[in-house]
Amino acid sequence: MNIHEYQAKEILRSYGVSVPNGRVAFTVDEAVEAAKALGTSVCVVKAQIHAGGRGKAGGVKVAKSLEEVRTYASELLGKVLVTHQTGPEGKEVKRLLIEEGCDIQKEYYIGLVVDRATSRVVLMGSEEGGTEIEEVAAKTPEKIFKEYVDPAVGLQAFQARRLAFNINIPKKLVNQAVKFMMGLYQVFVDKDCSIAEINPLVVTGDGKVMALDAKLNFDSNALYRHPDIMEYRDLDEEDPKEVEASKYDLNYIALDGNIGCMVNGAGLAMATMDIIKYYGGEPANFLDVGGGASEEKVTEAFKIILSDPNVKGIFVNIFGGIMKCDVIASGIVAATKQVGLTLPLVVRLEGTNVELGKKILQESGLNITAAESMADGAQKIVELVR
């Protein structure tokens, strides 16, 4: 789960991690009032969306007067911001962070992620702050330094200090930087983060180490332990289809193609998308209905797939183990009738009660194309949507 920058900074502040003073605003008047309350000569007006690259897209403005705050807030609120992370459709700006300006002397990058290769949290740092870390990794990987954290003891101060020296934090500010990194690590662990990224971390003219921007992502599987984090969820920033799917414990991710997929099991779902691509088609989604799909769940899955106007056909690929093929077949028939499906539908069933499942489909009287194998099904749906 993602949250906004201002929310991430609230969490960091509660752990003693240094961030600029700022206030969130939902209207132009609130933005002006926030700037007044800050009482600084320079304010930064920052668009709040769940995407990076806001500065390059014109989503961050420096205001030197209340009138400029009003002007920039008017420009940004309601604007569709397109960045390299939003896709061409962009995201509408519905809230702003009004923040005090900083006298930036130097920018750095600090981040925490889980390294799957070592099964450890890794603390990363670079003095190439303010740019995409992926770009730095591709062009100048030697400028990224890493410290691997032993989960038994956690991040040690000597590791944070070594990283601070490696990325050339001024010596007089190393202790500040160490405190910053230790606090960031504590947030990462306590809140079950998947990413904690500060880009840039800045050194200011008055000798402070501060998070100028902050990104926290959380492990969705651990959110049941964090009702406080769940309160930060902004459904406006999420795909409505994905939100609806989560209500029924369906794993749905929207893609750009025109062939809707309904599959049980993440591995089979990925293989299904691959084979559709192999035969020249484009999957419209990843949809895993799980191992215990009911008739209601299958119906909702169909509704979610069909809510995508780009979908021109549906491929249902089910291997019945825990889930029985006759239950899935009954669900498919009921869902097809309920939603009034007119698009091509190809169904491949295999596993428990497969013959009974196929019989239910054949006797339904509906226009359902049966497939004998995954490859056969993929070829048929690709041909039908052409």
Swiss-Prot record:
A single Gene Ontology biological process assigned to it is: tricarboxylic acid cycle
The answer to whether UniProt assigns keyword Magnesium to this entry is yes
An example molecular function term from Gene Ontology annotations: magnesium ion binding
Q: In which pathway does it act?
A: Carbohydrate metabolism; tricarboxylic acid cycle; succinate from succinyl-CoA (ligase route): step 1/1
* Keywords annotated in UniProt: ATP-binding, Ligase, Magnesium, Metal-binding, Nucleotide-binding, Tricarboxylic acid cycle
Function (record text): Succinyl-CoA synthetase functions in the citric acid cycle (TCA), coupling the hydrolysis of succinyl-CoA to the synthesis of either ATP or GTP and thus represents the only step of substrate-level phosphorylation in the TCA. The beta subunit provides nucleotide specificity of the enzyme and binds the substrate succinate, while the binding sites for coenzyme A and phosphate are found in the alpha subunit.
Family membership, please give it.
Belongs to the succinate/malate CoA ligase beta subunit family.
What this protein is called in its record is: Succinate--CoA ligase [ADP-forming] subunit beta
- Source organism: Geobacillus thermodenitrificans (strain NG80-2)
